Regions:
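Structural marker of alpha-solenoid helical repeat scaffolds
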Residues: 42, 78-79, 127
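Amphipathic alpha-helical repeat scaffolds of TPR domains
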Residues: 10-15, 43-57, 81-103, 133-145
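TPR-adjacent "capping" and linker segments in tetratricopeptide-repeat scaffold/adaptor proteins
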Residues: 1-15, 77, 108
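N-terminal interaction modules that seed assembly of large macromolecular complexes
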Residues: 25-59
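Terminal, low-structured helical/coil segments at or just beyond the last alpha-helical repeat
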Residues: 2-4, 126-169
Length: 169
């Protein structure tokens, strides 16, 4: 027997959003993701559902190649507010870098992700709503991670090459 998805009602969206938020707080990103897909099936441009879906996908990052970075990226690029898009794309790159750091990935693969997160947070900070320092807070967290992990430093990568070094024969 084939089971088919059922559609929620338009009037049920606010309650579905509340449930999706609750499941995120309970660290159940798969449930949040499912609810967001139900909302987006009837209202494809729902901004809160898009934002939560993107974040629910990043909540599942483990630092492996199977992480759904591209999917989260395409979802978050559908955000129409430029500040929100930049801010959440910054979080996307930050979370990917942190997951890869926890997974023990090579430091040289992480620095570009942190740098892209910082670029997004910097641009978001320039256009942030008055009184909203979220992008600054995320910027500072990324900088602290870089300071606390000297292997991630671009300077470290550059100092490993000496002028008298030559390529292997």
């Amino acid at each position: 027997m084939a089971y088919e998805l059922k559609s929620i009602s338009q009037s049920g969206i606010p309650e579905a959003i509340s449930k999706a938020e609750l499941y995120r707080y309970l660290n159940e990103p798969e449930e949040t993701e499912s609810i967001c897909h139900d909302i987006l099936a009837i209202e494809p441009g729902h901004q809160v559902a898009l934002r939560m879906l993107g974040m629910a996908i990043t909540d599942q990052f483990t630092g492996s190649a199977a992480d759904r970075f591209g999917e989260a990226d395409s979802v978050l690029r559908r955000l129409t507010d430029h500040y929100e898009q930049l801010y959440y794309l910054g979080i996307l790159h930050e979370r990917r870098a942190k997951a890869m750091l926890r997974a023990g990935r090579a430091p040289h693969t992480l620095l570009p992700l942190f740098e892209e997160a910082l670029r997004c947070f910097s641009q978001a900070g320039e256009i942030r709503p008055k009184g909203n320092d979220d992008a600054i807070l995320r910027w500072n967290r990324c900088v602290r991670i870089l300071h606390n992990n000297p292997d991630l430093s671009a300077d470290k990568e550059l100092t490993s090459f000496e002028a008298h070094d030559s390529p292997p024969a």
